[in-house]
Structures are given as C-alpha cells and as structure tokens.
Amino acid sequence: MKEKIVLAYSGGLDTSVAVKWLLDKGYDVVACCLDVGEGKDLELVHQKALDMGAIECHIIDATEEFSQDYVSYAIKGNLMYEGTYPLVSALSRPLISKKLVEIASKTNSVGIAHGCTGKGNDQVRFEVAIKALDPELKVFAPVREWAWSREEEIDYAIKHNIPVPIQHDSPYSIDQNLWGRSNECGILEDPYATPPKDAYDLTNELEDAPDEAEEIVLSFEKGIPVSLDGTAYKLSELILELNKLAGKHGVGRIDHVENRLVGIKSREVYETPAAEVIMNAHKALETITLTKDVAHFKPVIEKQFSEQIYNGLWFSPLTDSLKIFVDSTQAHVTGDVRLKLYKGNAIVNGRQSPYTLYNEKLATYTKEDAFNQESAVGFIDIFGLPTKVNSMLHGGYKDEQ
C-alpha cells in the first residue's frame, strides 16, 4: 500500500504541479483546501484536485475560525509587520497548518506537503507550525526541491495538461483571504515599476473611486468591531462588507518592500481595505480608552507580536503570552468611531466610548475649565529637578554641537 501525503492544495500553479510531482514519487495524495474567505470556487478546486490525481480532497470552511481566533488578534493588537503589512497571508498559515495536521491524523498520512518556494516566508511558517503540532510528521516541499523558474513551471504544467489560471504575460503569484489580498512576481519584482491595473482586484483606482466622500460609523465591543452604521454583523461578514465598501473608495492599497525572514527584500502589493478601516478606527478608540502607560507600552508588544506571526511562531509560549497581554488591554475598548472614506483614505473624524478617559472639562480652554493650572508650578519643579541639579553641578547645560 502506498504511503499518503496530505497536500495543502489551492488549485493554483504550484500545488497543481505538486500533485503530479508527488504522484511520480510514488505517494497517494490527499488534497486539503481551506476556505478562509478568499472567495474562490472551492467546488472547482475540489474537482481539479481529483482530476490531477488526488485520491481525496477535503474542503474545509474555516472562515469563522480564522476571523474569531486569528484576525481578531490582528485587530486587537494593531498588528502590522514593519508598521505597514497587516499580515494577510501570515495570519492564515497557522490555521492552515493546524487543519493539515488534523487531516493527516484522520487519514493516517505519513507527512504533509506544501507548495512554497525555497526563498519565501511561507515554507518556514508551515514547517515550524506543523512540527510544533506534530513533530513526527514528515514535511515535503516539492517546489523547493524542483527549483524551477516560474516560466519553467508553467511550461511543465502545459506539457502535462495541468490547467492553471496563469500565463507568461501575467505571471503574478496571488494569495487572498478574508483579511486581504497579496500579489507578487512578474513586473512587480521591479521595485520602481508602477503596478499595472490588473495587479489589483479588491480596490478601485483613485481616478475611478467616487468623487463624493462616504461617512460610516464602526462600533466596537472589547476591541472587536461588531456593527457598521448600526447594523450588527459577525466579524467575518463585517470584514467582507468593509472590503467592498472601502475598496470602492480605493482604500487599502499597500506597495511595500519588506524584509523577509529568509534574509532578502521582496516587493509586495497588498489590498487590505477592511483592515485599513478597522485598524484606523481601533487605534482611534484606544486613544480615549487606554491609560497613557498602556498606550505607550502596547506598541512594543504589537511589534513583537507582529514579528512572531510573520516569522511563523504562532504556536509558541511567547505568542501565547502576548495574546494574554493584548486581551487584557481590550476590556474597555468599546465604543463608536466615525470615519470618512474618500479617494484612498479612511479618515477618523470622531470617536466616543462609555469608558472614555477623555474629560472635556479638563481639556477645555473655555470658562468650563476644571483643570487646576496652579498645580503645574509644583509639578514642573519636581519634574525638572534632575535637569536643574545637573546644570547646577556643571555650571549650566553646554549646547555643544
């Protein structure tokens, strides 16, 4: 009896070719495809896997789990790798790995295969996660082993009658899920080349976006958005709705050269309309609900948390601890944020919360002012005392350039 390998199957170029490659190596292939909100025709993917020679194909709807257990932390933690990338693909990898391991256990498979290249981050994310969940499973990386160029891979697919939605004149590598869409390869490999229109799908060009701004109100409970303009949504549904709404206004385009885990720089084009709106709103709500010390320290945690996910370390003791900290900061991040969507921008122009720490009577400069300005004298004396003592000792501060 042949040994079984579970393949993380997307229906794209790499994994379609990988089915054929694994079959030639003498394995039975169990394909597994997760729906994490990417919007593709999964029935078509299911049939394609079987047509390619897989003995089984498991289609798993993990959209709700993805939104509740993974995207929720991206929101609560304001997670952005290098302050720019909302971790679109990176967030889904631990969940995909978890489901692959579950299928491997159910089907008595000896290992798991993925379609990642040898120079990307995903190979690390999948393999580290799989080994964290089941150290005994073998991991196969067909694309890394055959080391073909993109053009050679396309030629192989054509030669073996493998249908792939890709041609030499449009060789993009696209990954999409609920949280956004990433695009690389082709002309995008030149960091100075302007991305062509066909590189985008979720967002309008600014020239094609509506000429009138649109105001929306996003409501949060404990750091998670729960309604849009007064209508309640599940998190996954709210994200999909905002992707359409904000994408119409050209919101969420990111053109970024990032530092990959494997040591190279890579130009990536992302579309994250919902993520930009939600993150902007969430940060605005935190400004009135977090104490100063928490607000100043939380970005330190956010940076580390983002790097943990980007580097494939979701299943680790440190990440578990970071999640606990982030959760503890969100108890009072409840309220409403008003934003204006216009020509690529999601601009916050109002925020309110039943737990607001903003005291208008303390902040105002009108006659309603309740702030005791006389207390400033003593505060300044104490605050500036170390500076004063140092200057007394050294005869004044010398501003030497």
Swiss-Prot record:
Q: Name one Pfam family in it.
A: Arginosuc_synth
Q: Where in the cell is it found?
A: Cytoplasm
Binding, L-citrulline = 85, 121, 125, 173, 182, 258, 270
Top-rank taxon: Bacteria
Task: Give binding positions for L-aspartate.
Answer: 117, 121-122
Q: For this UniProt entry, what is the primary localization, expressed as one broad class? A: cytoplasm
Q: Which reaction does it catalyse?
A: L-citrulline + L-aspartate + ATP = 2-(N(omega)-L-arginino)succinate + AMP + diphosphate + H(+)
Q: Which NCBIfam families match?
A: argG (TIGR00032), PRK00509.1 (NF001770)
Q: How does it assemble?
A: Homotetramer.
Stated name of the protein: Argininosuccinate synthase
| Source organism of this protein record | Staphylococcus saprophyticus subsp. saprophyticus (strain ATCC 15305 / DSM 20229 / NCIMB 8711 / NCTC 7292 / S-41)
**Source gene?**
argG
